[in-house]
């Protein structure tokens, strides 16, 4: 099971951890993914989806259907 947002496609970022003595080591910054059961009004059904918290915040603002269409995601596959 990959750690990728199913709506936005957001995935892990490669970064650096920098110590006090400025020694840099590679670090993986994971996306904050949550499994959510959202009501899809147009389809009149519940949708189980794994999304990032950033996407969840956007869905609360614009709505699930509009957000999915803007990202080119078909909600019928969930």
UniProtKB/Swiss-Prot annotation:
Signal peptide: none
BP terms from Gene Ontology: translation
A GO molecular-function descriptor: structural constituent of ribosome
Alphabetical UniProt keywords: Ribonucleoprotein, Ribosomal protein
Record's GO cellular component terms: ribonucleoprotein complex; ribosome
InterPro entries, per the entry: Ribosomal_bL28 (IPR026569), Ribosomal_bL28/bL31-like_sf (IPR034704), Ribosomal_bL28_bact-type (IPR001383), Ribosomal_bL28_sf (IPR037147)
Coiled coil: none
Alphabetized HAMAP family for the sequence: Ribosomal_bL28
PANTHER family: 39S RIBOSOMAL PROTEIN L28, MITOCHONDRIAL, LARGE RIBOSOMAL SUBUNIT PROTEIN BL28M
Family assignment from sequence similarity: Belongs to the bacterial ribosomal protein bL28 family.
Name the UniProt record assigns to this protein: Large ribosomal subunit protein bL28
Taxonomic source organism: Prochlorococcus marinus (strain MIT 9301)
UniProt lineage: Bacteria, Bacillati, Cyanobacteriota, Cyanophyceae, Synechococcales
Gene name per UniProt: rpmB
């Amino acid at each position: 099971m990959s750690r990728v947002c199913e709506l936005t496609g957001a995935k892990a970022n490669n970064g650096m951890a920098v110590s006090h003595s400025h020694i840099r080591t590679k670090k993986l910054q994971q996306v904050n993914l949550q499994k959510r059961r959202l009501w899809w009004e147009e389809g009149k059904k519940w949708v189980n989806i794994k999304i990032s918290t950033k996407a969840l915040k956007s869905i609360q603002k614009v709505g699930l259907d509009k957000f999915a269409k803007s990202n080119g995601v078909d909600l019928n596959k969930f």
